[in-house]
């Protein structure tokens, strides 16, 4: 276990010596604690309202009103409840998020222009995810976001120009799963299939890439930005909590 940990640490340290263009991702400065709490409050309110909309009111105690305790509830229609539409920030919530210091950093370092509206909702699209312990169906398989932009969202190459993706863990234990990446994989072409799921065309990779991968040990509020063509994947976890994260695409100059 120690050897594995040391190897992982060495891989991360080596990857960090490369430029963003070479590795295809970068870990950004953490959000301020007060900003992280704003996000937790937004998500908690949306979480409780969505459960109430599905007539789920029976919380044993207030702790179960916290998204990180969601896995302790007896929910039979999980996938029905948590469609993407239930997890998209409102326009007001998005505006509040755009006031965060993160966007000044993105403007200075990456030429940030705007948060993209991938689904055509009419305003900057930011959404959150929950991943229960020991539920591999809650995490995404290995993919590049450009595949979804192309097939699921029907975006042209021109519409995808200068798009980058950002993922921020809100509730996470760094050593119990989060986001895995394949550094440098955005510089290669990968074959993949497509399937129809939930009425939409989605990409699917049916093999394990012969390429180095790294699990990023991100802390709550520590964002990672990555190229739309970078191979990455959600990591399942076993710890007694529900992982919560947000993600969005940005357009840069």
Where are these regions (language model features)?
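Non-heme Fe(II)-dependent double-stranded beta-helix
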Residues: 1-22, 29-142, 148
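A structural signal for short, well-ordered beta-strand segments and their strand-loop junctions
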Residues: 27-29, 117-125, 169, 178-182, ...
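Short, solvent-exposed loop/turn segments at secondary-structure junctions
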Residues: 32-35, 133, 147, 172-175, ...
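Acidic, His- and aromatic-enriched active-site or binding-groove loops in soluble protein domains
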Residues: 142-162
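Short, conserved, surface-exposed binding loops centered on an aromatic residue
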Residues: 155-160, 170-173, 215-217
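A short hydrophobic beta-strand segment most commonly corresponding to one strand
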Residues: 165-168, 240-253
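Double-stranded beta-helix
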Residues: 174-233
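Short proline/glycine-enriched turn/loop segments at secondary-structure junctions
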Residues: 235-239
């Amino acid at each position: 276990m120690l050897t594995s940990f040391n190897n992982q640490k060495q891989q991360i340290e080596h990857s960090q010596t490369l430029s963003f263009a070479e590795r295809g991702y970068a870990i950004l400065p953490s959000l301020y604690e007060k900003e992280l709490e704003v996000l937790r409050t937004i998500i908690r309110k949306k979480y409780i309202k969505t459960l109430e909309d599905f007539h789920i009111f029976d919380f044993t105690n207030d702790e179960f009103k916290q998204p990180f305790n969601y896995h302790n509830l007896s929910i039979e229609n999980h996938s029905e409840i948590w469609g993407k539409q239930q997890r998209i920030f409102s326009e007001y919530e998005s505006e509040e998020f755009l006031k965060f210091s993160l966007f000044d950093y993105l403007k200075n370092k990456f030429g940030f222009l705007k948060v993209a509206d991938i689904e055509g909702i009419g305003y900057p699209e930011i959404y959150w995810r929950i991943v229960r312990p020991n539920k591999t169906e809650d995490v995404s398989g290995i993919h590049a976001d450009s595949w979804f932009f192309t097939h699921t969202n029907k975006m042209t190459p021109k519409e995808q120009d200068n798009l980058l993706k950002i993922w921020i863990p809100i509730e996470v234990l760094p050593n119990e799963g989060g986001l895995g990446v394949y550094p440098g994989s955005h510089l290669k072409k990968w074959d993949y299939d497509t399937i129809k799921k939930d009425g939409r065309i989605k990409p699917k990779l049916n093999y394990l890439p012969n390429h180095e991968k790294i699990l990023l040990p991100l802390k709550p509020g520590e964002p990672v930005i990555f190229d739309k063509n970078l191979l990455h994947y959600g990591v399942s976890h076993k710890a007694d909590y529900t992982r919560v994260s947000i993600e969005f695409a940005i357009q840069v100059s």
